[in-house]
Curated annotation (Swiss-Prot):
Subcellular location: Cytoplasm
Annotated segments matching region Disordered: 1-101, 146-175
Keyword 4Fe-4S in annotation: no
Listed GO biological process terms: glycogen biosynthetic process; negative regulation of glycogen catabolic process
Protein name in UniProt: Inhibitor of glycogen debranching 1
Coiled coil: none
Biased composition (Basic and acidic residues): 75-95
More details: Present with 639 molecules/cell in log phase SD medium.
Organism of origin: Saccharomyces cerevisiae (strain ATCC 204508 / S288c) (Baker's yeast)
Length: 195
């Protein structure tokens, strides 16, 4: 009794088996296919074959991003601005160039701004937030605790009492808290103590 699932296909009935025999017959190998030449492969010109009607689209040269080109175009933009400024001194004109974005960033970083430029005190939209000043403008002296002031001087100098470390702030970074916690655990477990 033979199982029909275990039988191999007959040579005469399987077309894929017949095609695979082409590569197994070493006495008569198949012919090599011709490799297309690079000089005649879809290139426009006199040596290209006229087989296809559609010519490939030539590569479009993008705007140069070389440093010298950018500097030259920046100088040309400055010259245009100066000539425009001479003809119309009251009007503020702006020309865009290849380095317009970089110039904008540079101007934002290095331009000095006044508080009056940024304040909106004259505009009342009903949704403004009034900011209270942190320190009074009446006195420029820093405010110290009375225990730190020197009673012998006129109040311009301050001294720190000996024996107590100065408090820099009440809030410590979480990394310091973690380091203190580790130190306490190591001390309790005597991990790094001498044996």
């Amino acid at each position: 009794m033979t199982d029909p699932h275990l039988n191999t296909p007959q040579v005469s009935t399987s077309p894929t088996f017949e095609r695979s025999q082409d590569f197994l017959n070493i006495d008569e190998p198949p012919c090599a296919q011709e490799t297309p030449s690079v000089s005649t492969f879809n290139l426009p010109g006199p040596s290209a074959p006229a087989q296809s009607v559609d010519k490939p689209v030539p590569m479009i040269r993008r705007r140069s991003t070389n440093y010298m080109d950018a500097l030259n175009s920046r100088e040309q933009a400055r010259e245009r601005e100066s000539s425009i400024g001479e003809h119309a001194p009251g009007a503020e004109r702006r020309s865009s160039g290849p380095m317009d974005f970089q110039n904008t960033i540079h101007n934002m970083q290095y331009r000095t701004t006044n508080d009056s430029d940024l304040s909106h005190a004259g505009v009342d939209m009903g949704d403004s937030i009034s900011h209270t000043p942190i320190c009074s403008r009446a006195g420029n002296r820093p405010i110290f605790k009375n225990s730190y002031l020197d009673n012998n001087s006129n109040g311009n100098s301050a001294r720190v009492p000996h024996g107590s470390p100065p408090q820099l702030g009440t809030r410590r970074k979480s990394s310091f808290k973690y380091e203190d916690f580790k130190k306490d655990i190591y001390n309790q477990l005597h991990m790094f103590g001498e044996k």
